[in-house]
Amino acid sequence: MTFELVTESLLNANKINDQDVFIALEELCTRQLDYGDLYFQSHIHESWILENSIIKEGNYHSDAGIGVRAIRGESTGFAYSDQISLDSLRRSTKKAHSIILTKGSGKTKTLSKKTIEPIYKNVNPLEGFSSKEKTDLLYRANYIARSLDHRVIEVNASLTGSYEQILVASTDGNLVSDIRPSIQFSISVLVEDHGKRERGRSGGGSRTDYNFFLNQDDSSKEIRIDHWSKEAVRIALLNLSSKEALSGTFPVVLGSGWPGVLLHEAIGHGLEGDFNRKGTSIFTNMIGKKVASELCTIIDDGTIKNQRGSLSIDDEGTPGQKNILIENGILKKYMQDKLNARLMGVKSTGNGRRESYSCLPMPRMTNTYMLSGKSKLDDIIKSVDYGIYAVNFSGGQVDITSGKFVFSTSEAYLIKNGKIVTPIKNTTLIGSGLEVMQKISMVGDDLKMDEGMGICGKDGQNIPVGIGQPSMKLENLTIGGTV
């Protein structure tokens, strides 16, 4: 059903048929290619923004186009058009294949339509709710946040939804499609008390429609949008009473869920195939070697139902996969797209991703997480005489080559004598991804995925991702504070 809908929308409606697609691939093969593909995409997106208790913006954007790629060795010919038509397909094909100078007489394989089992429903979130119902979600969040505490002086909230259709045709005979819904809600709250101000943020998203926000969250047992609104206020008020963080080297307990962003940034990017093929990753040539504590098994899984980073197929037409990257501390594989996989003598892992038809695909993460261990969070906390409990992060930076990182917490606590004693702020975690992985001494049994807010940037391309981990203990991590 998905394939027929996408074919009708992207091809037939633009007076392109299967034979036209095959002829374009044949044209690519008049040069000596290792691989070539056509990428058709349509994308519609809306956003609603609330500030100062009023709707400040309502935006709608639509885009569609074709990307054509021809690959020989490490050379790539690429052209794209922001129109889907037979003429633009032909012109883009000629431009892409002209960059490959060596003539050839190769043949594309007969196109075979592959049915891929979708891991999210074919729903268009932009159509399910009226404009009033969408803005009412923002007004609801604003009301809840402001009614919780008189110290709330500012509430900013946003709602976004998108609906994407893609079709990939390649010289190896694949003809596959996908429909990708996506939604996200975010809220930021500013509180003030006696001239002192602090901010709290929360939100979430999924690959479904806006009803998701009005459904009950499994863990909090509250309506999701209500829960996130309360969370933003809670974090802001918590930071009002937080003490300045100490500097030094201490044990650190990481919370479950979003703190997995540290793994994503400090470890995940270093396991992407392009960095390792070029020798610029700290993990280059380390397949089969111990790179982490034996307690660590890290997975990238594009097949988790409705998760933000999930993909029925990647942007090269490879089905989404569950890849074990590190198993019991041993590096097992890198994440690969087709180009880097071929050059490294392995298969694509379903991680070829691109922001749009105007961008080249590259190895990217989907949903990256660490498996649960056997420890209870309470026992992990009790094992720390003096240290930090980092529940959530606000942001960070990492150097792929060295693996060094700096991350800032948005919610953290001081641990003394095995007990959480006081909230702290302005806390930064400083270290190296490779070193941190070796310092993991306890792993909790409470694996949790993030709420659906992940956006990953690489080489100017932003894509949705999922992040997760159980709670864990790191021995002797450098903490940057103000005291």
Swiss-Prot record:
- Keyword annotations from UniProtKB, A to Z: Hydrolase, Metalloprotease, Protease
Source species, domain of life: Bacteria
UniProt EC number = 3.4.-.-
Gene Ontology cellular component list: cytosol
Query: Which Gene3D superfamilies does the protein's record reference?
Result: PmbA/TldD superfamily (3.30.2290.10)
One of the record's GO molecular function terms: metallopeptidase activity
**A family per Pfam:** PmbA_TldD_2nd
Which GO BP terms sit in this record? proteolysis
Q: Which family does it belong to?
A: Belongs to the peptidase U62 family.
Q: What does this protein do?
A: Probable metalloprotease.
The cross-references to PANTHER family, in alphabetical order and at most eight, read: METALLOPROTEASE TLDD, UNCHARACTERIZED PROTEIN TLDD AND PMBA
Which protein is depicted? Answer: Metalloprotease TldD homolog
Species lineage: Bacteria, Pseudomonadati, Pseudomonadota, Gammaproteobacteria, Enterobacterales
Gene encoding the protein: tldD
